[in-house]
């Protein structure tokens, strides 16, 4: 990406102050969604998506539990529970979250070398678009700083479902308001929300970096620090959290 090392959030051609969400006082209620589970395995490759998302979500929840600034919530009663996106959105909304992160893994056809990180915030025109887009930028910046290649425009993209139920991927430079729905979880939850594609489970190098046991811990730490930055809190040190990424 040309100029990808620039802080995306500092780009403002109008000269206006960068957007910052209004967050109130802690503790903050943060909902973590393991994107697949139960009878829904997700994508299979070097690692299985549901195992990767469960491992990452569990570690992220642990980090949030150890930080008094946060109350972690979940969209499933257990990682082995089968639940549709609509059911998970409903369970999340019942708990009045202030932010939601849905963790997924990407995949590609046999022979593809596709790799990298991308994430999807609530689309333009939705109530929580600005907050979601801001959080998505934090996630992408954190992943890039830890060695992930960012896909698309700065790792932040939009998804729309067309009439034939086909998905249309749109870069985040396209800010026009559209009627088509995006991911159900993003549309139906009552808070800012981002769906993150952590890595390609079908790419050995990608899966080793962010889909292995240590890779999931690394990604969880990145997500935790992005959550802290979103709410303006100081993250606990890795030593206090009982985690070393070395």
Over which residues does each language-model region extend?
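Short, small-residue-biased leader/transition segments that mark boundaries at the very start
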Residues: 1-8
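Conserved catalytic motifs of the protein kinase core domain
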Residues: 3, 27, 191
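Active-site-proximal helix/loop segments of hydrolytic enzymes
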Residues: 11, 15-20, 51-246
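Short glycine-rich His-centered loop
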Residues: 27-46
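Short, flexible hinge/linker loops that cap or flank conserved catalytic cores
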Residues: 22-24
């Amino acid at each position: 990406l040309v100029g990808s090392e620039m802080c995306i959030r500092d780009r403002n051609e109008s000269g206006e102050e960068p957007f910052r969400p209004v967050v109130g006082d802690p503790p903050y209620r943060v909902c973590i969604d393991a994107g697949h589970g139960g009878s829904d395995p997700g994508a299979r490759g070097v690692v299985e998506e549901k195992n990767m998302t469960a491992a990452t979500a569990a570690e992220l929840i642990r980090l949030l539990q150890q930080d008094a600034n946060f109350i972690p919530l979940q969209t499933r009663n257990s990682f082995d529970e089968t639940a549709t996106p609509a059911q998970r959105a409903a369970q999340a909304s019942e708990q009045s979250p202030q932010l939601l992160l849905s963790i997924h893994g990407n995949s590609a056809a046999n022979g593809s070398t596709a790799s990298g990180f991308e994430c999807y915030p609530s689309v333009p025109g939705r109530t929580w678009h600005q907050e979601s887009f801001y959080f998505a930028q934090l996630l992408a910046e954190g992943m890039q700083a830890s060695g992930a290649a960012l896909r698309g425009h700065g790792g932040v993209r939009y998804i729309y479902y067309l009439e034939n139920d086909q998905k249309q991927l749109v870069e985040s430079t396209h800010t026009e308001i559209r009627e088509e729905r995006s991911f159900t979880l993003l549309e139906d939850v009552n808070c800012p929300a981002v769906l993150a594609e952590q890595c390609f489970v079908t790419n050995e190098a990608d899966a080793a970096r962010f889909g292995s046991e240590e890779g999931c811990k690394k990604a969880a730490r990145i997500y935790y620090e992005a959550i802290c930055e979103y709410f303006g809190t100081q993250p606990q040190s890795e030593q206090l959290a009982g985690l070393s990424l070395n």
